[in-house]
């Protein structure tokens, strides 16, 4: 009997859990008995991944914040190295979480295990010299965006552009009315979606300026509805506390675990920079982006940055399509006028551009990723 394909895999946060889920499904479509073990969230676990640690262990935001968790992170890494050394997989996949996964990948690669990093770190945006560490740590990088492969090719680092899983998952035209019915929102009301981040550290810094921005919007648009996407119960409770402290008179409808549906149901979106900005672009909703981290983390990031933009719609376009306000500018004095502009202008040209970009990165990424990894480990891929 042939030994089953065995894949080590580590995802560090919610977006990585979703990528891992699709990757596992695509591999299992060709190798139903394939085994997956490492660190995953609920979606990966539901697909049969054995998670040795809680994924929350790795969900740490910012350079400064990581320092406080460093002893625990080092212990988790050591345990994973020990496990994979004793039980070598056919390949190891690190999904995002580069500060953790690249170190783990380097150790595993040095021990003779083939390694893949899924989701390119933003070497094209800041700390470009990281590409040499990536080269030393990996046998292959799987990149979502076309300009990332161009960057890797320049340095002769193995990389495949696989398209973006979100571009595959989200339809070219999203159904606003169906989403409102699904969420129980009034069909004929104007809705603003508020997404203050998926991590505790993000919500702690971003929720208040977002709520204060909504206060100002409410003064001019008293019939505007505000719907908040909370990724889990912890983030829901955290947002509620900040809401009651900041603007208890304002009404928010908080909906858990359905960020995509919340954005689809909305007319416009106020969101924290990250994967959700790309998702919002693919849903074709006009947006304003705000983001804030610890001041020292922000200062370091600014010094090391080599790109003009933070949000992916702007990076993809190579110009400002959506307004973004980072650090001190993530404040209602900036966010409100930008949001007011979105609410009052004709956004049809923006939506057309979003549609073009959607088509550009739609390539069946789950299958592309699985096939790239299977090629790496010399398995015959199905057509």
From Swiss-Prot:
Top-tier EC class: transferase
Chain's gene name: lpxB
InterPro entries registered for this protein in UniProt: Glyco_trans_19
Pathway: Bacterial outer membrane biogenesis; LPS lipid A biosynthesis
EC number: 2.4.1.182
GO cellular component, as recorded: membrane
Keyword terms: Glycosyltransferase, Lipid A biosynthesis, Lipid biosynthesis, Lipid metabolism, Transferase
Similarity comment: family membership: Belongs to the LpxB family.
GO biological process: lipid A biosynthetic process
Protein task: Condensation of UDP-2,3-diacylglucosamine and 2,3-diacylglucosamine-1-phosphate to form lipid A disaccharide, a precursor of lipid A, a phosphorylated glycolipid that anchors the lipopolysaccharide to the outer membrane of the cell.
Protein name, per record: Lipid-A-disaccharide synthase
Catalytic activity field: a lipid X + a UDP-2-N,3-O-bis[(3R)-3-hydroxyacyl]-alpha-D-glucosamine = a lipid A disaccharide + UDP + H(+)
GO molecular function: lipid-A-disaccharide synthase activity; phospholipid binding
Domain of life of the native organism: Bacteria
